């Protein structure tokens, strides 16, 4: 492969040879002169024909029957001799010839001007992409992204038409995921979250810190969009919250029961997503799996609070509790779990193994494992949380498969955010795992069995800690009808939770950004805009400054620079706020879509849009909808 071919792509093509502007000018003028001569020749032949090829016109170059071919400029000589004749035929012929010459010369002048302009543009084009071809998307390029369509997708910003000064909302309706960089108090709620929730007609799971999204969007989603509006607020004491029991999602008495419980207990003993790093975590997880199976099979309180109550029962010590598991008949249906020798075993083998494991440990180790396990379940000792996780008023399966779409708001007061995080993490984990377990295929293509798409609107996403299932499955959950909209403050926040080798960012097809506060994010966004080629003009003067002999020479030099430098990214015009900190005017933003030119956009303000404003005024339900009681 030669060097030119190695540099040729749809984005940039290296010129084969540098062209001299002077040579291009001479070529253009030569063509223009040739055209003038052809025009004069046409005038000569026209006048000769009008005058009947009279012998007085002189001898022609060539005679072809009745046609005579004269020299190109002969008509000018004829005009000098006979223009004063009072013959209308003669004067008319010369008059028309002059008009023909004038019109033709004008056309040639236009051709010359166009050619010179085109040559200059080609010369500039050869150099303007030399160091990089980055630029902001034009109207056609914005349209090419598909974001200006009239679908029902999520809002990612707006684009202002420079010519018509008209704002165009940008919506992404594809299955791909969206990530937004938006610092606190930057207007992400009024510009991204609320417009999306006030228009998205399908199911949604919304991580709603402060409950603002429930208050402003659940009314419209329930009343106008035909959704079930469910609010799960674990710390609610007024009865307005739906209840959710994570253990109700376990498929008891199936081959999946152990895997379901293991997934739940792994999330419980790993509240920050750092993995099972020590002996106590691993032992606690194994113990809780066994105890959970016993509770689901044999205890009355089949909840997480029921597990901690069983482990901390003041009427018996740990050894008696473990022996109780071994002595319990879990096989009430008579299906049996045979022992290796074929004899019947009526105690669940996984529960029995966990209990026997604990009895075989030394007293100090056993005490440490029990203490660790109970510590992980302390949250569920709170009577409010215990009450709100006692039964399930909805099931994970309902989110995408109920007759109507379901909007689930995970409402967490800021004061309880850290305390309730393990429960919210557990629920999101169950959503992702439960709705991406099975895919059907027909005629060589995947077929989704769900009735509704599901939007995962997760504001302050990194605050949930590392969700391994999310990072692992983000690449394929779109195929199951799940679309993630992840909002983070800056890239370092994501790196803190997932490490610099994370794959969350790369699996988001659309990235939008408000003015960042951290230089790491600004540098990343600057690199994402790309490198542009800048043409620098310089002038030099010689001779007397005011004299007629002064000479001016101009030179151009191409250099590179980022389309936006890091400091320019940090200085993106932010939203204008009043004295109370409320947003009054939209700021600027950046919109990136894989495979497309970056868009310099404008923020949306939902309260300045009559449609959004009217929808936000629909009152939220006083109580959450209930789909089931299990």
What are these regions (language model features)?
Residues 474-476, 480-590:
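Conserved ATP-driven motor cores of ASCE-family P-loop NTPases powering translocation/secretion/packaging/pilus
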Residues 1-186, 190-193, 246-247, 531, ...:
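Basic- and hydrophobic-enriched, low-structure N-terminal and domain-boundary segments
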Residues 71-74, 87, 257, 317, ...:
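Short, solvent-exposed helix-helix connector turns and helix-capping sites enriched
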Residues 33, 66-70, 220, 291, ...:
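Short amphipathic alpha-helical patches
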Residues 138, 303, 565:
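Residue-level signal for threonine
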Residues 39-40, 44-52, 117-122, 161, ...:
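P-loop NTPase motor domains
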Residues 14-15, 70-76, 401-402, 505, ...:
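Short alpha-helix boundary/capping motifs
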Residues 5, 152-154, 550, 567, ...:
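Residue-level marker of intrinsically disordered, low-complexity segments enriched
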């Amino acid at each position: 492969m030669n060097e030119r071919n190695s540099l040729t792509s749809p984005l940039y093509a290296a010129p084969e040879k540098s062209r001299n502007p002077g040579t291009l000018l001479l070529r253009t003028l030569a063509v223009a002169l040739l055209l003038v001569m052809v025009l004069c020749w046409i005038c000569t032949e026209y006048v000769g024909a009008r005058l009947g090829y009279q012998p007085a016109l002189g001898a022609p170059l060539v005679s072809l029957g009745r046609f005579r071919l004269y020299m190109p400029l002969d008509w000018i000589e004829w005009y000098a001799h006979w223009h004063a004749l009072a013959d209308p035929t003669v004067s008319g012929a010369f008059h028309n010839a002059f008009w023909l010459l004038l019109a033709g010369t004008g056309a040639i002048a236009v051709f010359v001007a166009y050619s010179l302009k085109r040559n200059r543009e080609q010369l500039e084009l050869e150099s303007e992409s030399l160091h990089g071809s980055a630029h902001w998307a034009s109207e056609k390029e914005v349209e090419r992204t598909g974001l200006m369509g009239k679908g029902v997708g999520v809002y990612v910003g707006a684009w202002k038409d420079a010519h018509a000064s008209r704002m165009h909302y940008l919506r992404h309706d594809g299955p791909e995921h969206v990530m937004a960089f938006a610092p606190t108090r930057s207007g992400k709620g009024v510009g991204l979250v609320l417009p999306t929730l006030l228009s998205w007609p399908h199911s949604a799971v919304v991580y709603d810190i402060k409950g603002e999204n429930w208050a402003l969007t659940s009314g419209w989603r329930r009343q106008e969009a035909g959704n079930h509006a469910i609010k799960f607020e674990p710390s609610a004491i007024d009865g307005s919250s739906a209840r959710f029991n994570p253990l109700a999602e376990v498929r008891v008495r199936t081959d999946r029961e152990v895997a379901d419980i293991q997934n739940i207990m792994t999330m419980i003993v790993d509240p920050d997503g750092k993995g099972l790093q020590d002996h106590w975590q691993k032992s606690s997880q194994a113990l809780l799996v066994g105890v959970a199976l016993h509770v689901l099979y044999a205890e009355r309180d089949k909840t997480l609070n029921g597990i901690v109550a069983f482990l901390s029962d003041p009427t018996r010590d740990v050894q008696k509790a473990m022996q109780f598991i071994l002595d319990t008949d879990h096989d009430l249906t008579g299906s049996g779990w045979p022992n290796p020798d074929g004899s019947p075993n009526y105690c669940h083998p996984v529960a029995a193994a966990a209990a026997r494991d604990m009895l075989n440990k030394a007293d100090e180790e056993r005490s440490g494992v029990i203490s660790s396990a109970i510590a992980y379940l302390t949250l569920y000792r709170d009577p409010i949380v215990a009450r709100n996780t006692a039964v399930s008023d909805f099931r994970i399966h309902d989110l995408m498969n109920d007759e109507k779409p379901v909007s689930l708001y995970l409402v967490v007061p800021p004061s309880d955010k850290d305390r309730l995080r393990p429960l919210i993490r557990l629920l999101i984990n169950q959503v992702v795992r439960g709705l991406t377990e099975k895919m059907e295929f027909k005629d060589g293509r995947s077929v989704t069995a769900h009735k509704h798409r599901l939007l995962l609107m997760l504001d302050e996403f990194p605050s949930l800690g590392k969700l391994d299932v999310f990072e692992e499955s983000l690449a394929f959950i779109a195929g199951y009808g799940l679309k993630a909209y992840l909002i983070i403050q800056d890239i370092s926040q994501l790196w803190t939770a997932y490490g610099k080798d994370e794959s969350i960012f790369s699996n988001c097809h659309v990235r939008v950004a408000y003015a960042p506060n951290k230089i790491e994010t600004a540098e990343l966004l600057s690199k994402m805009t790309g490198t542009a080629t800048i043409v620098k003009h310089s002038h030099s003067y010689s001779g007397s400054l005011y004299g007629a002999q002064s000479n001016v020479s101009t030179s151009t030099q191409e250099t590179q620079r980022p389309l936006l430098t890091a400091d320019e990214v940090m200085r993106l015009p932010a939203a204008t706020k009043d004295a109370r900190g409320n947003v009054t005017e939209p700021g600027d933003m950046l919109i990136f879509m894989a495979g497309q030119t970056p868009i310099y956009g404008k923020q949306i303000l939902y309260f300045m849009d009559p449609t959004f404003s009217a929808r936000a005024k629909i009152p939220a339900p006083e109580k959450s909808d209930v789909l089931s009681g299990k």
